[in-house]
Design a protein with these regions (language model features):
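Short acidic-hydrophobic surface loop/beta-edge motif
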Residues: 18-24, 152-165, 217
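Short, motif-level signal for alpha-helix interfacial/capping segments enriched in acidic residues
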Residues: 14-19, 48-51, 184-194
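Conserved beta-sheet core of the metallophosphoesterase superfamily
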Residues: 67, 171-223
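Short, surface-exposed basic-aromatic patches at helix termini and helix-loop junctions that form
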Residues: 56, 132-145, 164-166, 193-198, ...
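Short, structured patches in soluble enzyme cores that scaffold and shape functional sites
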Residues: 121, 159, 174-178
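Active-site-proximal beta-strand elements of phosphoester/diester hydrolases
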Residues: 31-41, 169-180
Length: 223
């Protein structure tokens, strides 16, 4: 199993670090994590049955769950120029749209609360913060009592064999993403650029463009 600790870093440009500690590492040991992005939970296009199956599997295997933004869709408020009547779920057709989607997300995620290691922001949440001055991710994280992360940051996975030593760590940098993905590259060029200025990250992840791409990079550092 694991423990988590969110570390605040001083400085306007500093990013938060979420530390995940794992001990008792032996041969054959394994710890799983479920990384999700762009769920758009309140959209009628969200495949909630599939989402629930993934979360159920994570809970059954003791996996940690990390969301890196756009858990909410939040596009159907009456002040949003993108809203359409066909893209709002029936249960949200009231005069408390924002409250309703937060309440529903809390109810949906409550069974998995103890497995959630962090909830991050996406462009849909930050748009609501700018327009309506309410923090969707913060509200959800507070009610679930789980760590609230930012639009980008670090997750450091720390492994320790026993109390006498045998320590190592893996650094993951996450960024929700921005802009388009590119027809051919599907967002991989942005990751290559990130690898150049974040050389200490062993893993780089991002979402936003709704593409599934995995790529192995080599970064050479001076000794």
């Amino acid at each position: 199993m694991y423990t988590i600790q969110r570390e605040e870093v001083d400085g306007a440009d500093a990013m938060p670090v979420l530390r995940v500690e794992m001990q008792g590492i032996t041969s054959g040991w394994a710890q799983r994590f479920l990384l999700v992005s762009d769920v758009h939970f309140d959209s009628p296009h969200c495949q909630r049955d599939m989402l629930r199956r993934h979360l159920d599997e994570a809970a059954a295997t003791g996996a940690g769950i990390l969301s890196i933004g756009d858990w909410f869709d939040a596009m159907q408020g009456k002040q949003d120029p993108r809203h359409t009547k066909s893209d709002i779920r029936p249960e949200y057709k009231g005069n408390n749209y924002i409250d309703a989607i937060v309440d529903d997300a809390v109810k949906f995620l409550e069974p998995y609360r103890e497995h959630i290691i962090g909830l991050g922001d996406g462009n849909h949440e930050t748009a609501i913060s700018k327009k309506l001055e309410t923090d969707l991710t913060g509200r959800l994280a507070r009610r679930l009592q789980v760590p609230r992360l930012g639009y980008s940051g670090f997750v450091q996975f720390r492994f320790q064999r026993n109390e006498h030593g045998g320590r190592t760590s893996v650094n993951m940098y996450y960024h929700h993403g921005s802009g388009g993905g590119g027809i051919m590259t599907k967002g991989t060029l942005r990751v290559v650029r990130q690898a150049a200025w974040i050389p200490d990250a062993h893993i780089l992840v991002s979402g936003h463009i709704h593409e599934l791409v995995r790529r192995k990079l080599q970064v050479y550092l001076p000794v």
